[in-house]
Amino acid sequence: MTLSNASSSENTVELERDVVVIGAGISGLVTARRLVEAGHTVAVLEARDRVGGRTWSQTIDGEFFEIGGQWVSSDQDALKALLRELGKETFPRYRDGNSIYISGDGERREFRGDFPVSDTTQQQIQLMVDALDELAAQIDASAPWNHPRAAELDGIQFSTWLAGLSDDAEAIRIVDHYIAAGMLTKPSHCFSLLQAMLMVASAEKFEHLIDEGILLDERVVGGMQSV
């Protein structure tokens, strides 16, 4: 494939490559790396002025921040192997002290263990989690489109599905937060029930998405974007 920069007729640059990968996020970079390892020539095109996609690190007012993805899970064997190959060091998550919960009305509460909500809300949370686990168990995480109801499930907004299971706003907000803000980094009306099922299926069950000993295990020295 030939790539041509036609913005200036006097400064045309042509590149001959076997494959063009669109997007320099994690998927694009891994794809390009594997193609190169297989002996192909590759060009990666990225519209932004940086690589890494949802992994993004910045220094703001002299302090280093990871704005995007940053965690290394205990069961992410492929990522850990890559970190070893690149000589990247990790450090454990801070585990001491209380957790902080901000309720829907803005009240700040410190807690350990379960969320500081009513028993009824806890029951509604469990109801939604059980329903999501049951659906996630029905799909192949490597090929979710093969589910017999894939098109139907992909046409249902996750927010709509949650609202149909419970009228407990606090319970919905908590489950919504884990999948939407915590995992997929976008509002729950912007993705489908099928995508939520895939997220849970990729971790085997919902509990693994929120287990701090599994999901939020380590971080990378220098930030995940440096990988």
Locate predicted features.
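FAD-dinucleotide binding site
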Residues: M1-V227
